Amino acid sequence: MLEIDNLFVSYGQSEVLHGVGFSAARNETVAIMGRNGMGKTTLFKALVGMLPATRGSMRVDGVDVSGDESWRRVAKGIGYVPQGRQIFSTLTVEENIRTGLEHAASQRVPDDIYALFPVLFDMRKRRGGNLSGGQQQQLAIARALATDPKVLLLDEPTEGIQPSVVKDIARALNEIRKVREIAIVVSEQVLSFALDVADRLFVIEGGRFVHESTRDAGDAGRIREYLSV
């Protein structure tokens, strides 16, 4: 579903991603783990087209999107939830979700979105700025799902969110994968969350992958060492 091969990204003359490559299959969740400044957000910005890659390729469902602008990547199946819960604070919950339906045939919010996030249905007429941080994150995910993506990218979705809501988000992502049958890629620092949602885990350090394992491989201790250095 998502294939990244030998991706290089630079800021000016400084190379920050060095030949990164991974894949995420349909109905699979992949976690990119790493400390701050190791390249997670840079990678995600490159995947969504906000930063140009100097080399490498990206394919979504077999289609090469390497040279596409962000909006074209969205049209071809990329959904993106950026770091920091970026929602429209003056719009209602329902209006926020509908911004993801701008080019859809119908402006009706898909039923499964409210089924995945019941709290958003209860608050659908409330302004986004009046929601808690956890509710805003659920809203950001719901808006990305409204585009009916084939691949959902989430950059540090648990940042600044209370533990009880983190568990709700983990349950929702597992349900999204099952119901929508999409590929999900998350960047994370919280290992417990990654182990709850991910089939495979990568550790990025200095713009390179330095570790890869499956959830069942029992490598949690090794990954924790990378995150605590």
Regions found by a protein language model. Name each.
Residues V48:
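Helix-to-loop junction immediately C-terminal to a conserved catalytic motif
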Residues G56-D64, K76, S106-P110, A115, ...:
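Conserved ABC transporter NBD signature motif
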Residues L91, L131, A144-L145:
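ABC ATPase signature
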Residues A146-K150:
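A short, proline-enriched helix->beta-strand linker immediately N-terminal to the Walker B motif
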Residues K167-R180:
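Helical segment within the ABC ATPase nucleotide-binding domain
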